[in-house]
Amino acid sequence: MTPAHGTQPGMLPGHEFEALLGARHHDPFAVLGPHPDGDGTLVRACLPGAASVQLTDAGGTPLAEMARLHGGGVFAARLPREYKGGAPDYRLRVQWSDGSGQCGADPYAFGLLLGELDLHLIAEGRHFELGACLGAQWQRVDGIDGVRFAVWAPNARRVSVIADFNGWHPARHPMRLRHPSGIWELFIPAALGAQPGSRYKYDLLDPHGTELPDKADPLALATEAPPATASVVAGPGQGAPPFAWHDADWMARRGGADPYAAPMSVYEVHALSWLRAANDTQRGWEILAERLVPYVQELGFTHIELLPITEHPFGGSWGYQPLSLYAPTARLGPPQAFAAFIDRCHQAGIGVLLDWVPAHFPTDPHGLARFDGTALYEHEDPREGFHQDWNTLIYNLGRNEVRGFLLAGALHWLEHFHADGLRVDAVASMLYRDYSREPGQWVPNRFGGRENLEAIDFLRELNAVVHERCPGALTIAEESTAWPGVTASVASGGLGFDFKWNMGWMHDTLHYLGHEPVHRAWHHQDMTFGLVYAWSEAFVLPLSHDEVVHGKASMIGKVPGDEWQRFAGLRAYYGFMWAHPGKKLLFMGGELAQWQEWNHDAELDWALLDHPMHRGMHTLVRDLNRLYRELPALHALDHRPEGFQWVVGDDNHNSVFAWLRRAGPYSREVVLVVVNMTPVPRYGYRLGVPYAGAWQECLNTDAAVYGGTNVGNSGAVAAVDVPSHGQPASLALTLPPLATLVLRFDPGGGIQGAST
């Protein structure tokens, strides 16, 4: 179409029309909206698809009919009063060619939206409320309700909001660039269709003017459910204030707690496959609140750890390839439902940990990859920016805005959703520039080394900021190497995490468990080596999702032997783990002794609870958690060597292990743990203990209630003043086959007819 003939007010050169209607104008505010025109005001609007446009006052009284300057949909009118800036004092009444109509304030009549302090903090990577600054923010500007859109794309030639309220037309709502920050912004009034629930994306031209794939909002607070890829405008109460929280007591207690001395037993959950009924885009989180929370409460776990719930396009990634780091997945319901789930957990006395992925992101075209036509979030050089193992892109942590995007994203979950901690995924891949790379495939740091200095700085800053702003929130590293000081303080040169997954312990002990009992004598050190370094870091002992997939077998499937030996061996192993120094983590299904590996497309095999052996395993996990929480000796000194002492660590011939756990260096709160990893019962097995007197058998994994043979010590044993194993007293035990015993010293206990 061509410009209208004549000399209508507001006529533009032909190239301006072409730029506006072709969605290629780099500065739409220079020509659209109100502009001084002598003693009046000239108003232009670009509204492709409009049949007519009228200017009215705020009350709807007509002021002027806008003339069509171009057949493509550019209009202009002159108001007989001077424009002085500030709030728009007119409205656009649009009659669309399909017969519908709208009347609202002109998006191009509003002044600058983001303050200079906001822009400065974004550029410094220190805007910790980024989720309330960028993205789509429902708010009131100059007395008018609407949505403020803002996105970082410094190298784009043009950015437009495209949405269901503007026909996904890039010429309808081009944005304003704020130099030199690279932030594009636009306020679209609600009367023009921008509302909570609106679906939107960004349409960008790269630095050369080439159109890019439509992009989802990196700061979206809500999204469509995959496979759809649009972002969604989130309204008030959707996870951020003013959501009505009921967990003030929980948050206050959390802030004053000592996580190292407290019991911590984590139930790791993939929310989409724990129960298939929860795969409900409206009620998923509500269903989990109704079913998962009381289930975890009954089993006695202190925390739920959720595999990544940030929105991710590929369900088969289990959430570990996320794109919307500020939005909970829409597969389970809206953001406010996720907040309500966490609120319910806290009211039930259960903490919530979230797996969080700052190491890499997928290459989906609607995501962060070459967001503005350049390597914006990632490194340009694939030797730094491409992860060969996962076919993903690596965040450029040397860039302030990228670092700030991730830091604010972490705080978003902790502050606005009240999450109790973050388990940071794939830390080892972040720390080493040559991680999973051959010579020539990586770029050394500025000193010529393999350490990723930018990642080290980022992780230290992450932990410092989280601990400063979120009292009691935990950070946990999945770090699979021997990097020193992962849980040492930042001030002492460490990374500053609260805990680290003990991957070495997990690999060694599962390797031992997989051997036939007759061969375990030659692998005894697999069970004992973890105590050599147990206090070098603050550890979590993880039996995670990664250990029950990809041909590794389920937990019960790892154990050799007939069915009885498998169940007994796994019960003994769980007892060994719960009594071992370190916090605990068990992936869902482990409590059921599922035969099949985890399948993210199916739910847990709940029917197994109808079978006595599986029900027995379930009961054992409940009782292990109860005992672990009730006995300070099993958790109070997890992080200090004073809480542990070997009694027998070298009986490889019998595959027996025994140790003491203490609640304090001089405490008489003492527990004896004995593990027999062969199917042979041992009678009269003498062990040294620090005190003569009654020792109560608190737990026997061979008890009949768990599916065992009920071999044991009749509930108690009397220790006598016969030195053994460097201790002043000793007792003689019956060791059940493939079982763990936990005995507690009872200073006031008396035993009739007990064995000695």
Swiss-Prot record:
Coiled coil, from the record: none
UniProt keyword Transmembrane helix, yes or no: no
Pathway of action: Glycan biosynthesis; glycogen biosynthesis
GO BP term, pick one: glycogen biosynthetic process
CDD domains per UniProt: AmyAc_Glg_BE (cd11322), E_set_GBE_prok_N (cd02855)
Highest taxon of source: Bacteria
Catalytic activity: Transfers a segment of a (1->4)-alpha-D-glucan chain to a primary hydroxy group in a similar glucan chain
EC assignment: 2.4.1.18
Gene3D superfamilies: Glycosidases, Golgi alpha-mannosidase II, Immunoglobulins
Keyword Secreted appears in the UniProt entry: no
GO MF term set: 1,4-alpha-glucan branching enzyme activity; cation binding; hydrolase activity, hydrolyzing O-glycosyl compounds
Active-site residues (renumbered): 425, 478
Entry GO CC: cytosol
Keywords: Carbohydrate metabolism, Glycogen biosynthesis, Glycogen metabolism, Glycosyltransferase, Transferase
EC top class, as a word: transferase
InterPro entries on file: A-amylase/branching_C (IPR006048), Branching_enzy (IPR037439), GlgB (IPR006407), GlgB_N (IPR054169), GlgB_N_E_set_prok (IPR044143), Glyco_hydro_13_cat_dom (IPR006047), Glyco_hydro_13_N (IPR004193), Glyco_hydro_b (IPR013780)
PANTHER family documented for this protein: 1,4-ALPHA-GLUCAN-BRANCHING ENZYME
Family recorded in the similarity comment: Belongs to the glycosyl hydrolase 13 family. GlgB subfamily.
HAMAP family the record matches: GlgB
Subunit description: Monomer.
Function in brief: Catalyzes the formation of the alpha-1,6-glucosidic linkages in glycogen by scission of a 1,4-alpha-linked oligosaccharide from growing alpha-1,4-glucan chains and the subsequent attachment of the oligosaccharide to the alpha-1,6 position.
Name listed for the protein in its UniProt record: 1,4-alpha-glucan branching enzyme GlgB
Organism in which the protein naturally occurs: Cupriavidus necator (strain ATCC 17699 / DSM 428 / KCTC 22496 / NCIMB 10442 / H16 / Stanier 337) (Ralstonia eutropha)
